[in-house]
Design a protein with these regions (language model features):
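Conserved alpha/beta-hydrolase fold motif
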Residues: 69-70, 95
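A conserved short beta-strand
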Residues: 89-103
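Short beta-strand/loop motif that positions the catalytic acidic residue
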Residues: 125, 130-133, 137
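Gly/Ala-rich beta-loop-alpha elbow adjacent to hydrolase catalytic centers
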Residues: 70-79
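Conserved alpha/beta-hydrolase "acid-adjacent" motif
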Residues: 138-144
């Protein structure tokens, strides 16, 4: 059976089109071994977590077998929030979080997006979890990755250089790990 990936886009006007390049790159790198499902999330310009949560749940339910979840930027933080609040309808074979904002950091205080107090324990049944971030990310500060690393030592941290917020539209490192799952 093919591996099935659910890729959740970032937020903001034009994010779906921008992240489509990431999803397409990942599909090209993985070839016929995987299917990358890339749904357009509701109201990308003014994201509401509840609407995205419902869409994530619906898309996750149509996957066959184990799911691999990937989120970019706001999509990464919404994947994390979803997994801390809900029991996924499918077994999760891996989680890949790209340029995830740490909600609650200075100038990033959005209560609706923040994780609960005991969010780390929610991931005890889900492994592996990878966090990727480029040191030169111009949207989400690299310090957000450091905050996750401090609070979430079980996560596998991948620090990249010169890739920016969109990873130069190249997810080679992510694809290499997915091939091993």
């Amino acid at each position: 059976m093919k591996k099935q990936l659910l890729f959740i886009q970032g937020g903001g006007q034009g994010a779906y089109a921008a992240d489509l390049k990431l999803a397409a790159n990942l599909q090209a790198l993985l070839g016929f071994e995987c299917d990358v499902l890339y749904p357009k999330m509701p109201d990308e310009g003014r994201p509401v977590y509840g609407a995205w949560k419902a869409r994530i749940a619906a898309d996750l339910s149509v996957l066959e077998g184990e799911a691999i979840l990937i989120g970019h930027s706001l999509g990464a933080s919404f994947v994390m929030k979803y997994l801390t609040e809900e029991k996924p309808s499918k077994p999760v074979a891996g989680v890949f979080l790209l340029a995830a904002p740490y909600w609650g950091a200075e100038d990033w205080e959005v209560e609706e997006y923040a994780l609960g107090e005991r969010w780390v324990s929610a991931f005890s049944d889900i492994q592996p979890i990878y966090l990727y971030h480029s040191r030169d990310d111009e949207i989400v500060p690299f310090t957000h990755l450091e905050r996750y690393a401090e609070r979430f030592p079980e996560a596998i941290i991948r620090k990249l250089d010169g890739r920016g917020h969109q990873f130069n539209n190249d997810l080679f490192e992510v694809a290499q790990v997915i091939k091993t799952l």
